[in-house]
Structures are given as C-alpha cells and as structure tokens.
C-alpha cells in the first residue's frame, strides 16, 4: 500500500505544476492571425454551395417524381388495356 506521505508529495507536485505552468495558447503556436476583415467569407461560400446543391436535389426529385408518375400511369393503362378493348378507354 502507498504511504500517505508519498501521496501528499505527489498531490503537492501536481498542484505546483498546475499553478506554475499555464497552458500555451493555440493562436501563438499557429503563427500570425489574419484579421477577419481580410479573410474570405467561408461560411457565405459554403451556404451558397449548399443552396445550389439543394436546388439541384429539388429539381432531380421533381423530375424523378414526374417520371415515376408517368411510368405508373403507363403501367395502369397497360393493365387496363389487357382487360378491356382499346376503344372503351377513350
């Protein structure tokens, strides 16, 4: 079992280390900081890209929906044509 004196010494060293050594700032390590005014608006570009992608998806979904509806109507008409004479459908 570890003696209480040893535990106290370890706790004291940890406390001193936490008090004396402050964490380094990430900005200092990264180098110079570019002011926000001179940076391109990444969020704006991402938003515009996502808007265009969403519009493309909406168009594709609409086209697929219209195509599916056309195919379903064709299939229903063929099924009716198999059961009934052609002149009664019009």
Curated annotation (Swiss-Prot):
GO terms for molecular function: mRNA 3'-UTR binding. It comes from the Eukaryota. It holds the Pfam family Neuropep_like. One of its GO terms (cellular component) is extracellular space. Keywords: RNA-binding, Secreted, Signal. InterPro entries: NICOL. The keyword Mitochondrion does not apply. Its main location: secreted. Transmembrane segments: none annotated. Residues 1-26 form the signal peptide. Belongs to the NICOL family. mRNA-binding protein which interacts with a range of target mRNAs and may promote extracellular matrix production. This is NELL2-interacting cell ontogeny regulator 1. It comes from Salmo salar. The lineage of its organism: Eukaryota, Metazoa, Chordata, Craniata, Vertebrata.
